[in-house]
């Protein structure tokens, strides 16, 4: 009888420990690419609606002190997931960072060439002998090079002006005639709020191959497929909920922090929704190969890697 009691007690303890283990959430550190904004909608909604929690995840969402840090911190094993950009991912891998793309957040470019609607640029050929502002050298100049090439304008026939992050202000003050690197869901709306009409030339229509604007990256030496499957499934559910309930989710998002509840973010919210990846875990291999070819042709990389070096499918 004593032995039977002991066996029963042991079985109960094991069952309790298994049940407790099954209900222990995976703690995950997610580094954002920038301060929280509508581009991060699915992440915030998955958190606020309890979607992450239901999947067994405890996500710590951290905006970076320096936007250049998240990929480096993931590479160093100091964070589990980071949000980054496909164009920068190519460069990071060529620099030797052990990172890879595991999912997509925003599936179209947001970058555009922004001009004043009543300004001198009516067609891209009008860029000849004009001033073009930029904030990041290298990548943005490569994008601009492709745009100019399609417009049959020699890149030596334009003047490049580093305006740092003052993109729309430098355009509105007519310090420059156009800016590259402006986000179509933000700077265009910022100008509208200030009573200035702008116009975007969409780079994917003007010679630049389409790419994923925002992606999820991890350290390629430490890929937790179970955790990432739960994470990407949660992002997919949150994205579907946003698309089905845009007004409700705007209220949820804007209540996440009082700084988010403003006119610019509300306008950007609705402009960003069509850009979210409906299948975050899906991988367009050709998209990564094609952009690698583009960077090679523009001279930003000296050799080409296959897509397997840059991106994987978790399931």
Across the structure, where does each feature detected by a protein language model lie?
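Bacterial N-terminal signal peptides that target proteins for export
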Residues: 1-9
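Hydrophobic h-region of N-terminal signal peptides that target proteins for export
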Residues: 13-22
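Short, glycine-/small- and polar/acidic-enriched structural segments
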Residues: 27-163, 168-173, 177-185, 200-201, ...
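Periplasmic-binding protein-like
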Residues: 39, 105-115, 196-220, 232, ...
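Short helix-capping segments at alpha-helix termini
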Residues: 51-54, 150-155, 194-196, 226, ...
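Secondary-structure end/capping motifs
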Residues: 224-300
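C-terminal solvent-exposed extensions
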Residues: 292-315
